[in-house]
């Protein structure tokens, strides 16, 4: 058993993972992204300065931490270079801190074109993707036709492979979706201009991480999105295209599951969701507006307004089961300050009157579900910026305790603000 830690979302993403990863990397040697792509949006606030990362791991701001983009991530060269440039302009030496797996599938312009064309064609049934080509890139990976970072080592062979795959996708874009084709030469020129930069950061990630664990060096795995968006276990088809759950760590990084010792589930004190899909506890009243405005619930990646609602314990329990959670970090507790009453969903009532305490698997099976709530007194005192559990209002402590009782998982960390210092650590994941 290793002391390595996984940090992942337990809801529909946007739980506040970036801040917690940044906070905990003080103890880590490596921080690894193992799934997703630049559809993630991890916001960090350090000494009042805000940083939003979409692709590069949140550990990049730490001087002695090595950040790794592993094989489970679909990599947009354009997005990576943009993010690297922004960080380097702030004096952060990204190229000496960042490593890539040669097995990362590349996101190229035809993936983005397909993503947007499909969403437009779906009309009202659109999934609500970020339009960044994530799904189509994973499709090419599974179909074994995708280009990977490692293909850039042989530029002549890459050019031929690119020509063939662009012809394949352009046929669909032009003849089915009736949109403009992707330009082969421009795509080739753009990727060749940065090919040496990408290949210069390539390492054997699986071997590196294995040797690191043998030396006792600590690794943190940074999840993107959330458990309920998992391609297999989420509200299908309103899901992302990767395994956002703890099982994705081994396949997405090449390090075996025995080398994970603690799984930290990030749980927002209420629920949010971006885009379409089931959301039983969604609020359409002034309380929902209150949570959205006070919580600044607007996507870091898309800027879209997030749907808001009460904490859904039934959905959280599913995340506990799937991920073997060791503990929770509860974020945005301060957003609930000032509410006279707070609620948590403890059951679902089906249209036929039956009450269930587990989440359905397919999105259609959520149709007509009504949440069953348990109410608790709210609190007027501010929890914002509190750094000591003893200073939290009793009603807030009761809320935390009730979540622990209903899920069977301890709340080991409480986040009371966006800055890394605004945190109460009750049990450190690396010491658990």
Curated annotation (Swiss-Prot):
It catalyses: IMP + L-aspartate + GTP = N(6)-(1,2-dicarboxyethyl)-AMP + GDP + phosphate + 2 H(+). It is found in: Cytoplasm. Binds 1 Mg(2+) ion per subunit. GO terms for cellular component: cytoplasm. The keyword Nucleus does not apply. Homodimer. This is Adenylosuccinate synthetase. It comes from Proteus mirabilis (strain HI4320). The lineage of its organism: Bacteria, Pseudomonadati, Pseudomonadota, Gammaproteobacteria, Enterobacterales.
